[in-house]
């Protein structure tokens, strides 16, 4: 399983490294999968923990919830995500009711929610994670998964045929002068 460092987790969640450390260590809301070995070394996070952190950021920023009051929900989600496959979460939403009970529902089943609840669509979060963790995305064909998830490749761009043709052609031979001699 691929784990990312605190710096990458900060980028993926939108949390500052200070806030991420506070949530993972000091307040112990969502602990890192691998705590730092020593002071100055980074903690490591799995896709499940990053997804949970993204959900927590959404609850805090969009719904203005105090996360300490919803610690039980976060703990239950963390436990559930440990045994849930990434692929099975596509097309699902998280539902949290006022009694702090939560469930995964299909995006098409919003009518099944009775009463008041907070709904968080998972697809935008999974989309971001699938790129950074090289996890599979849903296939356009039902029941078909990507054999090898595409990973971004970093490096200098290769020259295009147009840029090669537009480069001036340089000859290593001298030009002939009017008298037939090479210059």
Model-predicted regions and their roles:
Residues 1, 57-183:
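Basic Lys/Arg-rich amphipathic helical interaction modules
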Residues 32-58:
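Short helix-start
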Residues 13, 26-27, 63:
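Residues at alpha-helix termini
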Residues 17-41:
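Major-groove DNA-recognition helix of helix-turn-helix-type DNA-binding domains
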Residues 4-5, 51, 65:
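An amphipathic alpha-helix/helix-turn recognition signal
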Residues 1-23:
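Polyanion-binding surface elements
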């Amino acid at each position: 399983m691929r784990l990312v460092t605190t710096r990458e987790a900060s980028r993926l969640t939108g949390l500052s490294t200070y806030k991420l450390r506070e949530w993972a260590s000091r307040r112990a809301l969502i602990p890192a999968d691998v705590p730092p070995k020593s002071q100055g070394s980074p903690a490591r996070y799995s896709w499940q923990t990053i997804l949970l952190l993204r959900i927590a950021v959404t609850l805090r920023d969009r719904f203005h919830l105090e996360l300490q009051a919803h610690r039980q929900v976060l703990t239950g989600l963390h436990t559930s995500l440990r045994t849930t496959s990434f692929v099975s979460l596509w097309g699902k939403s998280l539902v949290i009711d006022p009694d702090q009970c939560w469930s995964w529902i299909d995006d098409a089943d919003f009518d099944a929610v009775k009463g008041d609840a907070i709904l968080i669509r998972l697809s935008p979060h999974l989309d971001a994670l699938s790129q950074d963790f090289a996890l599979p995305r849903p296939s356009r064909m039902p029941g078909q998964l990507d054999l090898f998830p595409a990973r971004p490749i970093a490096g200098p761009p290769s020259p295009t045929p147009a840029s090669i043709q537009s480069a001036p052609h340089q000859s290593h031979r001298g030009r002939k002068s009017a008298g037939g001699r090479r210059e």
